[in-house]
Curated annotation (Swiss-Prot):
Domain of life: Eukaryota
Family annotation (SUPFAM superfamilies): Cyclotides
Domain note: The presence of a 'disulfide through disulfide knot' structurally defines this protein as a knottin.
Any GO BP annotation: defense response
Cross-link (Cyclopeptide (Gly-Asn)) at residue(s): 1-30
Pfam families xrefs: Cyclotide (PF03784)
Name by which UniProt lists this protein: Cyclotide mden-I
Organism field: Melicytus dentatus
């Protein structure tokens, strides 16, 4: 549920490397 400061509208989340995932076009972690 914590925003990772990255969007995933056009490209996947790079922050998946630290546990973030794409939700509602924004990358979140927990």
């Amino acid at each position: 549920g914590i925003p990772c400061g990255e969007s995933c509208v056009y490209i996947p989340c790079i922050t998946t490397a630290i546990g973030c995932s794409c939700k509602n076009k924004v990358c979140y972690r927990n």
